[in-house]
């Protein structure tokens, strides 16, 4: 038979054990920290993009809908206009690295990330681009990455195994003129100038070789716009966009992907 003192000793041990467990739990390093550095909690937005099952489901669903809306075969001059970041390339690793170190966005750190050419593909985009190419289509990647980084963007895209060539794909980053054009007739957001140049056959593709330049020197017809931001759609801004007016085109000509990490909002 156990003595009262024995019960007391056991109770003390249990309390000590529980206390140690609590202390250990409180002092353990969160999984979001980098080795040897102070731990920082990731935002819900980054956790959603990098860890949730909902994000790849939604992204893949949008691209499946876009595939269903593609023509059986593209007509001469038809083109799909796409954004790059969080539309084709997934930069959540950059966001995660910055937040893990208690840092936010900076133009220098972003440029350094782009130069690493390590962004992965947004779920569903590979199948979509495969279908565009199979149907004799073309893609214009109108990105607000600085135009001086276009070569790195192109290299990153090719490294991901996408079936892109200088004939079927045009990469065009932003320059000062794109922002300066806003407010001029027909120029509502800072991608509208490049969209207009595309339709006029005046688009300046950074990745286009001399042999392929003639394929982009003719006027093009934009049949679909895909992005993660409402301003990836021509003629609207976050402030001016009328969702009710846009909805008849959503699912046929306009496709918007989820991006909780950043945006014009």
Task: Report the location of each language-model feature.
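C-terminal cap/substrate-recognition subdomain and adjoining C-terminal extension
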Residues: 31-36, 146, 150-265
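Second-shell loop/turn segments in exported
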Residues: 48-57, 111-119, 140-146, 178-185
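N-terminal secretory signal peptides that target proteins for export/translocation
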Residues: 1-9
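Acidic/histidine-rich, surface-exposed loop or edge segments in extracytoplasmic proteins
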Residues: 39-54, 108-112, 135, 172-174
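Short, acidic loop-to-helix structural element flanking the phosphoryl-transfer center
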Residues: 112-140, 146-153
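Metal-dependent phosphoesterase signature
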Residues: 89-90, 95-121
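Structural recognition of the beta-strand scaffold that forms the well-ordered cores
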Residues: 79-83, 89-90, 133, 138-143, ...
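Non-catalytic pre-domain segments flanking phosphatase-related domains
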Residues: 2, 13-14, 24-82, 265
